[in-house]
Amino acid sequence: MTAQLQTSGNAKTVLVTGGAGYIGSHTVVELIENGYECVVVDNLSNSSYDSVARLEILTKHHIPFHKVDLCDREGLEKVFKEHEIDSVIHFAGLKAVGESTQIPLRYYHNNILGTLVLLELMQQYKVSKFVFSSSATVYGDATRFPDMIPIPEECPLGPTNPYGNTKYAIEKILNDLYNSDKASWKFSILRYFNPIGAHPSGLIGEDPLGIPNNLLPYMAQVAVGRREKLYIFGDDYDSRDGTPIRDYIHVVDLAKGHIAALKYLDAYNQKEGLCREWNLGSGKGSTVFEVYRAFCKASGIDLPYEVTGRRAGDVLNLTA
């Protein structure tokens, strides 16, 4: 089958770390549809090679894949040697807020060290364009400031959990690296909110290997009988129904945002480089109960649920 798959000739090659994962896989589709070639690196800790195979079916393109952990410098350098990388979109990393409060050292080691190894190799191989998958968790509890909901990019940062701290630390690293050599780097930092949904083909979507950390896949697993009930973490927040408010953005829209950010870097031709942050959200906040009721209505299933205590590190409102 691979021999029949297309390539795009002299197209620019983008290294997509975490490209077998939820957001990464959808972004690979958009990259190929926009004329880029992709190389996917993933350690498959929360995904499977099946998603890469599905991407090849979906795009009718051969997609080089390397099972490599970013902390493995030798393994990652082989990828840079084998492919002429033009730019990097960096998704790879641990990403569960609650879990990060339980195993913080693993989060700091994996997310920060992996990014450092990646940046060092980019510097060594003179790859200057970098789109970073950051998170709205870097803002922490924006309600502690007046007039900061919806959250603007200039909102003061203050993450409330180790996961958010790793994203904040990486943002600081990128700013420091840019300021050390402004002519050599172009950085797009994308702070996004809560991705949901799946590709319209139905071939790819959010299907984590373990217990889902996001609301929609958890509800889906309850609906098909893989989980007994939905757990709602807290109904005593100062919201319209007591549950936290989140900004849910469709994953395909989010993927298109990464393409826009990369094209912005491609077209940016100023003497100095760039290091800029953007929020990616829908601009509309919905409570957990509102999403729950919408899911039940759409599926025709009244999902069983149980309200438990608040999850460590969660905040009231994250809306773009």
Annotated model-derived regions:
Residues 199-212, 219-222:
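Hydrophobic, Gly/Ser/Ala-rich alpha-helical and linker tracts in large acyl-processing enzymes
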Residues 1-198:
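N-terminal Rossmann-like NAD(P)+-binding domain of SDR-like oxidoreductases, especially those catalyzing
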Residues 144-148, 201-202, 268-272:
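Short helix-coil transition/hinge motifs at the ends and kinks of transmembrane helices
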Residues 68, 80, 107, 207-211, ...:
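Pocket-edge positions in alpha/beta enzyme catalytic cores
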Residues 126, 178, 182, 200, ...:
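Secondary-structure transition/hinge residues
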Residues 190, 201, 229-232:
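Oxidoreductase cofactor-interface core, primarily capturing Rossmann-like NAD(P)-dependent enzymes
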Residues 159-166, 208-215, 247-251:
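The catalytic Tyr-centered alpha-helix of NAD(P)H-dependent dehydrogenases
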Residues 215-320:
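C-terminal substrate-binding subdomain of Rossmann-fold SDR/epimerase-dehydratase oxidoreductases
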